[in-house]
Amino acid sequence: MTVMSGENADEASAAPGHPQDGSYPRQADHDDHECCERVVINISGLRFETQLKTLAQFPNTLLGNPKKRMRYFDPLRNEYFFDRNRPSFDAILYYYQSGGRLRRPVNVPLDMFSEEIKFYELGEEAMEKFREDEGFIKEEERPLPEKEYQRQVWLLFEYPESSGPARVIAIVSVMVILISIVIFCLETLPELKDDKDFTGTIHRIDNTTVIYTSNIFTDPFFIVETLCIIWFSFELVVRFFACPSKTDFFKNIMNFIDIVAIIPYFITLGTEIAEQEGNQKGEQATSLAILRVIRLVRVFRIFKLSRHSKGLQILGQTLKASMRELGLLIFFLFIGVILFSSAVYFAEAEEAESHFSSIPDAFWWAVVSMTTVGYGDMYPVTIGGKIVGSLCAIAGVLTIALPVPVIVSNFNYFYHRETEGEEQAQLLHVSSPNLASDSDLSRRSSSTISKSEYMEIEEDMNNSIAHYRQANIRTGNCTATDQNCVNKSKLLTDV
């Protein structure tokens, strides 16, 4: 190895074998110098050799920045030593050689290779490309409010795992949702059901009919429902004013479900008040039909649990990622229903006791047969109809089985991504900086070696520099174009 300081470069150029006539421009000398410079990298005993210009393509990385890699230099062996994973470095070095292409070796686990990417500081862009190649779905960024109190409120209501009070609020919210769903179901029991078509009781006193009309505001179910709606409204309003973006707030499907969950209550309340004030019996039947439809919307409150349930979130993400496969499944079922309903109709057309009066009437039979449900309310009686029914069931099994592996694969991906430990969580939320400041480097250096050890290494390196410079000058085996220069900001080695 030949090592020399930048301040002695002119002296070395005067030695035998170094041109002095100026026939070679300095720029050309510098280019040849850069071309011939090589560096040895030792990865746990396995030595790699490459050119410095290859590493210099990415100056913000650990190997591409001379200051960053300086603390790993071994002056006695004239190489950089890293006690890291060997198989991973093949891909790391190829990243420099290929100009930015990163491929994980098949024998290196995903989390281990991610740690190597972070150690060599390849940057967030390289990590994102790596995750994309590995099949990771890019997660949406979730910005936080800028104001401190607004951020605290947002974390309190939006992220239950952020603090203890946030968990308490999440538990209260889940309990209120469950109570609301239980009330929605219990009020339909015959023993507790209040007939909305006639909300009153008749008593006869001295040949006089007295009608006592029940008041909805005294109904226990309505009172409990009101308390639940108060909590839902409070939670929605607080999260709206604390959210970082009002536009993104309304784009979130969960917030849309929250709004839909409370609208039926206010519509029902307004309708009841209008009926009591107007007392128009002619419009009562119409309003009751509308109210029944509106009350049905309350069942969507069960989806509010997905805000606090990882399982429901995984299911939703799986369905969202599998929309193409689900669309193909529905399309195949649609084709099968048309084909087999038509076939069974014509196969049973001559049968007097046929259950299939028309092709649309046979749609139901085709659907339940292809999904292998088979209610038995409609069935073929002829031999031809039974053959069609058998083919319909077989085709249904094959049709449903085709997209299932893709959907299961998506579910496994989202499930493992949500349930794996902190190590995988760091992989999915990695944010490695592109640049490291000198203060960070000094802190990391101090944590690696002590000051006395560093001074000893520096002294040995200076002695090595002087030794190799004198040896090369005496032998005259090196020229100015293949000399290695060492100064305060740059360390170059030649092997």
From Swiss-Prot:
Residue numbers on the Cytoplasmic membrane side: 1-164, 243-253, 309-323, 416-495
* Effect the entry attributes to changing residue 446 to A: Abolishes phosphorylation by PKA
* InterPro entries, alphabetized: BTB/POZ_dom, Ion_trans_dom, K_chnl_volt-dep_Kv, K_chnl_volt-dep_Kv1, K_chnl_volt-dep_Kv1.1, SKP1/BTB/POZ_sf, T1-type_BTB, VG_K_chnl
User: Keywords assigned by UniProt?
Assistant: Cell junction, Cell membrane, Cell projection, Cytoplasmic vesicle, Endoplasmic reticulum, Glycoprotein, Ion channel, Ion transport, Lipoprotein, Membrane, Palmitate, Phosphoprotein, Potassium, Potassium channel, Potassium transport, Synapse, Transmembrane, Transmembrane helix, Transport, Voltage-gated channel
Region labeled Tetramerization domain — which residues?
A: 1-128
This protein's GO CC annotations: anchoring junction; apical plasma membrane; axon; axon initial segment; axon terminus; calyx of Held; cell junction; cell surface
Q: Where is this motif: Selectivity filter?
A: 372-377
Superkingdom of the source species: Eukaryota
Q: Which residues lie on this side of the membrane: Extracellular?
A: 187-220, 275-287, 346-359, 380-386
Protein's cellular compartments: Cell membrane; Membrane; Cell projection, Axon; Cytoplasmic vesicle
What are the Phosphoserine sites (modified residues) in this protein?
23, 322, 437, 439, 446
Region annotation Disordered: where it falls in the sequence: 1-30
Q: What does this protein do?
A: Voltage-gated potassium channel that mediates transmembrane potassium transport in excitable membranes, primarily in the brain and the central nervous system, but also in the kidney. Contributes to the regulation of the membrane potential and nerve signaling, and prevents neuronal hyperexcitability. Forms tetrameric potassium-selective channels through which potassium ions pass in accordance with their electrochemical gradient. The channel alternates between opened and closed conformations in response to the voltage difference across the membrane.
Subunit arrangement?
Homotetramer and heterotetramer with other channel-forming alpha subunits, such as KCNA2, KCNA4, KCNA5, KCNA6 and KCNA7. Channel activity is regulated by interaction with the beta subunits KCNAB1 and KCNAB2. Identified in a complex with KCNA2 and KCNAB2. Interacts (via C-terminus) with the PDZ domains of DLG1, DLG2 and DLG4. Interacts with LGI1 within a complex containing LGI1, KCNA4 and KCNAB1. Interacts (via cytoplasmic N-terminal domain) with KCNRG; this inhibits channel activity. Interacts with ANK3; this inhibits channel activity.
Q: Report the family membership.
A: Belongs to the potassium channel family. A (Shaker) (TC 1.A.1.2) subfamily. Kv1.1/KCNA1 sub-subfamily.
Record comment regarding domains: The cytoplasmic N-terminus is important for tetramerization and for interaction with the beta subunits that promote rapid channel closure.
State the name under which the record lists this protein.
Potassium voltage-gated channel subfamily A member 1
Q: Which organism is it from?
A: Rattus norvegicus (Rat)
Organism classification, top ranks?
A: Eukaryota, Metazoa, Chordata, Craniata, Vertebrata
